[in-house]
Amino acid sequence: MKKKIISFALGIALLISSLSATTVYAAGEIEVVDSTSYTVQTFPVDTTDITEPLRLALDYCSLNSSENNILTIKIPAGVYCITKTNIASSNTVLDLTEGATILNDCPGRGNIINSPSGYYGYDGLKNFTVRGGDLGYTDENANESTLSRIAHANGVRFENVKFTNGFISHFVEVAGSTNVVFDGCVFDGFIGDLSSSSCEAIQIDILEEYEHFSGFPYYDATMNSNVTVQNCTFTNIVSGVGTKSLFHGYYQNNITIKNNTFTNLTGTAIYCSGYTNCDISGNTITNCAEGINYFMMKSDSRLGSVCDIDNNGTINNNCGTKIYNNTISVNATDEISTASAIYVFGNNVTSSKQNKYDSYAKVGNYSVKNIQIFNNTINTTAHGIRVYDTVNSKIHNNTVTSSKSSGGYGIYAANSSNSNQIYSNKINKFSNGILIASSSKSNKVTKNTVNGTGNSGIVINSGCDSNSIDSNTVMSSGKNGILIGASKTSSVQSNNISSSKADAIHLNSKANVNVIKGNLFNVHGKYAIYCDKGSTANVYVNNYKNSSGRYGYSKGDKKDYKFANLAVPTVTVSKKGTTATVSWKKVGGANDYYVYRSTSKNGTYSYIGHTKSTKFQNKKLKKGKTYYYKVSAVKVANGIKQRSNLSTVKGKKI
């Protein structure tokens, strides 16, 4: 191997004239080796400015490499600078593992290495890897320039590269590319804050000409796909991975962000805008202002910044994303006071919103559909998991803990978040544990454990209909265990509620609950069930045994009353002709009786009528047919229907 010898005196002179006091380089040469490690070409390096020899090496690879002849450019150990952007070549490895550091010293908005421009689709740079070494900036470079920009590429990898000392810019930008991987890289140090920059270290961006990704034609609506960021470390920067930019109706697809570590970020660790089929898993996020943001459309105030590409985009109906097995610790800051560990956002863009914010976003509901959030461990000073306009999704098996019992929500579903399953989560402290708000309907809240909230454990706000709260454990709430606002709630069943300082279950005025049944009450400050004036409910049998008052309470316009369980009627059935007479003894406290019938003993029983007496006649039955009956004792007062369990089945053949 050919070596270029530089005298000691010349080396000293070069160090004094060309380098800062902390910069050194090793004289030698850039080698280009083939897949057998045979050196096929060399380019001398005799100055700290490596721009020209690296360009020559890349040009050589551009002419001589192929899919069957991968060439590797090996940079010798040392600290070098780049003063003009170099263009990467396909089927090439840039190897910095011998200890090379390359610093961006471009006088303008230049970069260390970019993909070539002037391509469509993914037909530009192919099969290019940067391996090892350090990439950063000289102390004098304050040009807010990215270190590397990749577009229209297929098969680009950054392996074990350390990126350092950013200045109000991304470290790497990727747009309109596929099969891009960042593996084992480190991103450390950044000058700037949220007031001057929200830059992600790795920006997985849109290919938009004027504001976001200039200089990389052709702008053909090519979106990123199959981008992976794994095993990387992000420390002491603003934001980690993602983008805040999006086109209406176009989506970045198959984005994987896994097994990374984010520490001491003043912004958001992972920020996804318009991403579909994402795998966000196994990440450790510590002492960051926000954890994971997932936006299908921007919020109202930011609709004006939605970008336009053409009129061919369509609204996504299945985001297909999973956020799981992440460990997240977030601390709210002055800039992000409503910080969330996980924040999911869809938006229904109406014509009035479109006009008001002069937005390119097409009119339509950009809801988040089919996202799964599970097995995450969260500690936060603000919110745990917040979802807006999120539909047909699952939030389950998360452990969500607040450092305080005032302010913030453990799990919050709002803005028409409908038909979601929220189950098997463990929630500690917060103001409210689980809150359903803003016209969110048909959600199932089941088998969650909520402990130590400052206000209520589980809350259904006014206007949120057809939600069910079943089989949850709610402990030590500062106010109510379960609070129902002015909404039509399907059921509150089989919950274990203990040590609420106010009521176990509290119904506000105009609340309407179809079923309150099978709940276990233990030691409450006031009532097991409190029904405010104007509320309505069907209250079946509950376990009041260990409740402080051992009863419920109904507030009325003229009279209040207490209630507990009604006894079950003992039923007999007789017949005369085609009439069956169902009879029972009076049940104490009941003022009405509901009768149900089936033509099969173990079949479905349908309501056939009610009576205030102790006898009910069922007429005009078919001869030779057997009819089966059940009866429930009922007390109706102040809009509350207190019901006993159904009686034992009794039948009669006509």
Predicted regions and their residues:
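Short glycine/acidic-rich loop motifs that flank beta-strands on beta-rich extracellular proteins
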Residues: 82-85, 103-110, 135-147, 167-173, ...
